[in-house]
Swiss-Prot record:
The atypical FHA domain contains a 'wing' insert and mediates binding to threonine-phosphorylated IRAK1. It catalyses: S-ubiquitinyl-[E2 ubiquitin-conjugating enzyme]-L-cysteine + [acceptor protein]-L-lysine = [E2 ubiquitin-conjugating enzyme]-L-cysteine + N(6)-ubiquitinyl-[acceptor protein]-L-lysine. This is E3 ubiquitin-protein ligase pellino homolog 2. Phosphorylated by IRAK1 and IRAK4 enhancing its E3 ligase activity. GO terms for biological process: positive regulation of MAPK cascade; protein polyubiquitination; regulation of Toll signaling pathway. Signal peptide: none annotated. Pfam families: Pellino_FHA (PF04710), Pellino_RING (PF20723). Its EC number is 2.3.2.27.
Amino acid sequence: MFSPGQEEPSAPNKEPVKYRELVVLGYNGALPNGDRGRRKSRFALYKRTYASGVKPSTIHMVSTPQASKAISSRGHHSISYTLSRSQTVVVEYTHDKDTDMFQVGRSTESPIDFVVTDTVSGGQNEDAQITQSTISRFACRIVCDRNEPYTARIFAAGFDSSKNIFLGEKAAKWKNPDGHMDGLTTNGVLVMHPQGGFTEESQPGVWREISVCGDVYTLRETRSAQQRGKLVESETNVLQDGSLIDLCGATLLWRTADGLFHAPTQKHIEALRQEINAARPQCPVGLNTLAFPSINRKEVVEEKQPWAYLSCGHVHGYHSWGHRSDTEANERECPMCRTVGPYVPLWLGCEAGFYVDAGPPTHAFTPCGHVCSEKSAKYWSQIPLPHGTHAFHAACPFCATQLVGEQNCIKLIFQGPVD
């Protein structure tokens, strides 16, 4: 449907318009095996050379599968709602010159602009794949206005290679009071808009489900329940800076150009790393100098790497003594304050899109040890992210590890002039 070349059009003497960016939670700047093509941890949506949007047009009531197939194979985009073996509603879509459409899903077929797979928590290698993915092959579509302010709306389900969306007999679907059909996908597309935007003062919003036609509903009892939630008429499917999109297996963060303009850059995070290292923090026991490893070497524990006791926040170098538990190999007693708890290496959070401010990296998530600014750590510590088909819990945005402890994060205590 779209060639890869259309992703980033290059008009002569003119910078392409970037609508927004999507960042996949659980990756610290790149996929474990590297970003490749339409599979990456961060995806920019650019204005297309030619409008790619579609809008609803003709509605057909058909009584045979053959008639339904005939309409669906005309070359137009269409959504088929199978009500029974003898009744299907087919909604044809026509070209919309005022919008661009981008599709997200697990499929690697050409209609998908941004390929996402199940996020493995803890930053494990992608080879430790889930045996059966819960992400839909054609999960959702995002439609952006081609004119300012480039409003973006999200819809459940994406068009396949035949330009069709099929909602079978068992799918949740219904006819609205105004007569138009709508439905939900099997595991649903959930969206959460933070209160107050994506800033230092933001608070978590309420998770909602988005329908195929873009209406907003309260959550079903479980992800795949037949009964839809209640329509929330006061809310819309318009995405805003900091909106979270959950596809049941991967969660995406929506960032606007203005939001990213005020966010730290990769260079800023690297400068903060160098600033901490220049202060020469020391292990209070071994008195050896500690240093955060280069951003390019964020998978390998290095000799000078800082480690921390996550129950108290004291930062040390690595040592093998202090075990206080036969069952928990990671439980150690801090030599500074005698507090017992997890003892882990510290990793700098490198994905700038997850920061709500440009503050210094002073706090670590527990139990993974990813470090970022205080306000960013506290923001993510209070966000309930969908887990599985009916659970929610806070998780580290850099590795998707479920957070634990009283605050889900801890203030780090460095020995020396850093603190």
